[in-house]
Amino acid sequence: MIVTTTPNVEGRRITAYKGIVVGEAIMGANVVRDVFASITDIVGGRSGAYESKLQDARETALSELEGRAVALGANAVVGVDLDYEVVGQSMLMVSASGTAVVLD
């Protein structure tokens, strides 16, 4: 499965558009990790706890996106957009959307 942010795939022709597909993931952050992440942010370091959560959420959203594209009979998703949003006090939502297509 080819997943790309570009509107097409160089050297390949889109032969069918199957529709818009979306994958979403909402992850809760652990309170203890939040405290340590805040301390890390204050001293100017990177927060490994948040980075790990963000990576997990992104991978889950993209995996769902691919699964929905496969269910439509697509072999690629073009024009993929990733959006990140904090929900409530400690929830992270990642959504991935794009167009499921068939490439030759």
Curated annotation (Swiss-Prot):
Sections of the chain in a coiled coil: none
Any single Pfam family the record assigns to this protein: YbjQ_1
InterPro entries associated with the record: UPF0145_dom_sf, UPF0145_YbjQ-like
Recorded family membership: Belongs to the UPF0145 family.
Name this polypeptide is given: UPF0145 protein SPO2021
